[in-house]
Amino acid sequence: MAETKTFKVFRFNPQTDKKHRFDTFKVPCRPGMTVLQALNYVQENLDGSLAYRSSCREGICGSCAMHINGKYRLACETQISHLSASITIRPMAHMDIIRDLVVDMTPFFEKLKAIKPYLIPGDPDEGAERIQTQDERAYLDYIVDCILCGACYASCAVNGYDDEYLGPAALAKTNRFLMDSRDKADEQRLALVCDEHGVFRCHTLFNCQTVCPKNVDPTANIANLKRQIIARQLNPGFSKKGI
């Protein structure tokens, strides 16, 4: 027999509502059921107007990040059996609400765009391969898994009061390309994150590290950016391979 759990879901439509509310739904939950499957049940059987994002259902696309029982998580990976009998779901913070659990992620992606999230390889000989050794690639293994879900951005306290702060995802992505042996734009990249809304705005609270579903550890990436900047100030001839 399926266990019934109570879901308290944030609801708000800025076009019609003056303030938000929480709607309560009773959902029969079977073993192995995820929060995303519960939301699907609500939408298909109880309230078809409920709005939320989802796509892959396998923790790959990052679409279904939301605030579940006090923590930012991927709904498709969160097992209901690991949660309490009453489950509260809210949208991600620091972004405008489009409707219910759907937020406008434009600021998140604009900040990502600002740090030039692509290789800038310099000018190799025409037709030459940009060779990367296994060790050089292995260094990036823990960084490249970011799925741009926005959980780190929503959990970041600095993003809550500084709208211009680049945020953990953009800064971690900066480190990903800075430490790529094929990239030749070190000074350009560091200059992009070295202003008052950049890397030194981070207070090292580890919120982003705690919520990252892919263990990218934005905090460690940001710390490396700080080291890289300071090392260059102390030693203009410094090479990033030194750290």
Label each PLM-derived region with a short phrase.
Residues E3-T24:
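Eukaryote-biased recognition of intrinsically disordered, low-complexity regulatory segments
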Residues F22-T34:
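Short, contiguous acidic and Ser/Thr-rich linear segments
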Residues M33-G48, I87-I243:
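Ferredoxin-type iron-sulfur electron-transfer modules in oxidoreductases and energy-metabolism complexes
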Residues R53-S54, S63-H67:
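DNA-contacting interfaces and partner/effector-binding or oligomerization modules
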Residues R57-G59:
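Beta-rich nucleic-acid/ligand-interaction surfaces
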